[in-house]
Amino acid sequence: MKQLEEFEKKLGYSFEDKKLLKEALTHKSYKSPVNNERLEFLGDAVLDLVVGEYLFKKFPKANEGELSKLRASLVNEEGFAKLAQKLDIGKYIFISQAEENNQGRTKPSLLSNAFEAVMGAIYLEKGLEKVRELSLKLLEEAYPKIDLDSLFKDFKTALQEFTQAHYGITPTYKLLGSSGPDHKKEFEVAVLLHEETISTAKGRSKKAAQQEAAKEALKILKARNE
């Protein structure tokens, strides 16, 4: 089937069993005796191991908590949907007309599940090494800078842990002001430590501004403690 061959080229892997590939790309809404849920289950477990091992080797000084946070920031729906988009999986999945009408081809959940299923199918056919090779190549393309700072989604938590460990206190956040019309309001927030302003940042919401300010504060404080 031409459509599947086109996908295999993007993936960089040609399946020996084309039925297995079609199963991996078949959503449960599609009228078919099989769907990709079982392969998704397998792929999820395999990717958990592959990414966990990758981070374990890449960050030899990271502790268990840091490694868990790093993995959680990559092994999730949003992360796998990003890898699926690199392969344009949405173009090749088999979905029902109702799902088609509901923008199913761009839904992060469908893309993520299909990506996991494809990796599960590759694992069945070629084993762990092939999954490792293909998934890590995609991962490094999607995340050119994989490090402890850039992967932590929750910078406020990371900053709090850092300041408690190094200074014995928790940072505080101060709203400096807001600007712009209601539909495009921007907030400015400062991070303070011992009444000292460490960083300031702006965001479209108070939470976004706090995260951005925490990210900057973390960089500044880490540089001070080097």
Swiss-Prot record:
The keyword Cytoplasm applies. The lineage of its organism: Bacteria, Pseudomonadati, Campylobacterota, Epsilonproteobacteria, Nautiliales. The active site is at residues 44, 116. Disulfide bonds: none annotated. Pfam families: dsrm (PF00035), Ribonucleas_3_3 (PF14622). Residues 4-127 form the RNase III domain. Digests double-stranded RNA. Involved in the processing of primary rRNA transcript to yield the immediate precursors to the large and small rRNAs (23S and 16S). Processes some mRNAs, and tRNAs when they are encoded in the rRNA operon. Processes pre-crRNA and tracrRNA of type II CRISPR loci if present in the organism. Its EC number is 3.1.26.3. It comes from Nitratiruptor sp. (strain SB155-2). Belongs to the ribonuclease III family. GO terms for biological process: mRNA processing; regulation of gene expression; rRNA processing; tRNA processing. It is found in: Cytoplasm. This is Ribonuclease 3. Keywords: Cytoplasm, Endonuclease, Hydrolase, Magnesium, Metal-binding, mRNA processing, Nuclease, RNA-binding, rRNA processing, rRNA-binding, tRNA processing. Its main location: cytoplasm. One of its GO terms (molecular function) is metal ion binding. One of its GO terms (cellular component) is cytoplasm. It catalyses: Endonucleolytic cleavage to 5'-phosphomonoester. Transmembrane segments: none annotated. Residues 154-223 form the DRBM domain. The keyword Acetylation does not apply. Mg(2+) binds at residues 40, 113, 116. Its cofactor is Mg(2+). InterPro entries: dsRBD_dom (IPR014720), RNase_III (IPR011907), RNase_III_dom (IPR000999), RNase_III_sf (IPR036389). Homodimer. SMART domains: DSRM, RIBOc.
